[in-house]
A protein has these predicted regions:
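Extracellular beta-helix/beta-solenoid repeat scaffolds
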Residues: 5-112, 133, 137-147, 151-152, ...
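A generic structural motif
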Residues: 122-128, 157-173
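Proteolytic processing hotspots in large secreted/extracellular or virion-associated proteins
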Residues: 114-138
Length: 237
């Protein structure tokens, strides 16, 4: 096992079954194959990750990953950068020039609409479908007015059919009227606010040490005569 803070390379002839959390490394390079089995929650934490010619996989289309997987990149905005290519360098970065395949799980309903208006101060709302939504999940309610900042992110405390109870209370009003007539030419405009389910079991997480988010780059480059073309399948992530 690598020690904390080391640079780690998975060689091209290796297949690693990651059934334990690795140490917090500085730079993880994957030239071989890393498979995360669906046996328990898993955390990967580094300063930078490069899937160079290899692959990182959790789950598949037939058997999605059902546990929690957090891929966390740490670092500060002014930390020294890593050079991947003359045209690509940076810190707090995840670069894919190989293959990244992540298949998570999500409820059957990931987007719904309000069936009645929800007002500032409310701690419940009703949507047209909440299939698979559960206590502890997070949802986001789209704004109904001109300011894009009036979206709201809340945590579900209870579910009763299509009625969702949550915390904290709403700060803004969100329309649930089914439609309004604009005119005979343009017909009907649906004014119901959208409600999105945003809880996922596979997450890309920026380290808590700064407000500087990390960058996921799916990239193509030449290495000598070899052309590397990154591929990513991110399903319910």
């Amino acid at each position: 096992m690598p020690l904390p803070g080391e640079n780690v390379t998975v060689d091209g002839n290796w297949t690693i079954i990651m059934d334990v959390d690795p140490a917090v490394c500085e730079f993880l390079t994957i030239d071989g194959s890393v498979i995360i089995p669906d046996t328990s929650d898993r955390n990967i934490e580094c300063q930078a990750i490069w899937i160079r010619v290899g692959s990182l996989q959790a789950g598949s289309a037939a058997t999605p990953f059902t546990h929690n997987l957090n891929i966390q990149i740490d670092g500060l905005k002014n930390d020294p950068g890593y050079v991947f290519d003359p045209s690509l360098e940076g810190n707090k970065i995840f670069v894919v020039t190989g293959t990244l395949s992540l298949y998570g799980t999500s409820p059957s309903t990931i987007s719904a609409n309000l069936t009645a208006s929800a007002f500032a101060g409310n701690t419940s709302l009703t949507v047209d479908s909440a299939s698979g939504w559960a206590i502890g999940d997070e949802i986001v309610i789209a704004p109904s007015f001109s300011s894009s900042r009036e979206y709201e992110r809340v945590s579900i405390t209870n579910v009763s059919g299509n009625t969702i109870y949550f915390t904290p209370a709403l700060q803004y009003t969100h329309y649930g009227a089914p439609s309004v007539t604009i005119n005979n030419t343009y017909g009907i405009l649906d004014t119901r606010a959208s409600v999105g389910h945003i809880t996922r079991n596979i997450k890309f997480i920026s380290g808590p040490d700064s407000g500087w988010g990390y960058t996921l780059v799916i990239y193509s480059l030449w290495e000598g005569i070899n052309y590397r073309a990154g591929q990513a399948i991110l399903n319910s992530v």
